[in-house]
Amino acid sequence: RVLRDAGFDMDLDGADSFSIQYQNANNSVRVSDEFMQAVVDDADWSLVGVVTGQVIKTMKARDMWRQIAEAAWECADPGLQFDSTINRWHTAATTDRINGSNPCSEYMHIDNSACNLASINLLKYLDADGTFDVDAYRHTVEVVFTAQEILVGRADYPTEPIAENSRRFRQLGLGYANLGALLM
């Protein structure tokens, strides 16, 4: 309501909506070693349709790299995923290649897999005197990680292949939130 009352066009096809439609998206571009070499060599690079495999457009790799860099500088997107490196460092390389990630790219694995993610709010461990309660934090890590491990076996997944791979590989991700606020 506030934006509408301030005169913004709230129509879904309106100019104002168009300018913010991707603000909550997290976009990445996946590049290979061959693409990076084409950037160095200022060579042509073909954009290929994922479904059809047909060349859609050919352009200078260096020009595309500049567009990616400028877009990232302007709005922090796209992120970059280095496909060749990702698959070289694959922790289950004998299974299949890694084709994608979750939106924030902290989880990369084979198709039809999932990672149970959780975060711990670091500010909850900041005592009144400004010290960090390491013992309580360690205890929380142990409890949450154990809970995540239990959840893998008890969770429902959208498809049977995702359920099978989740239970087979048991990927877990435990992170933290509010590091910046904690340090301030």
Model-derived features with residue positions:
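Active-site cavity-forming subdomains of large catalytic enzyme subunits
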Residues: 1-139, 153-165
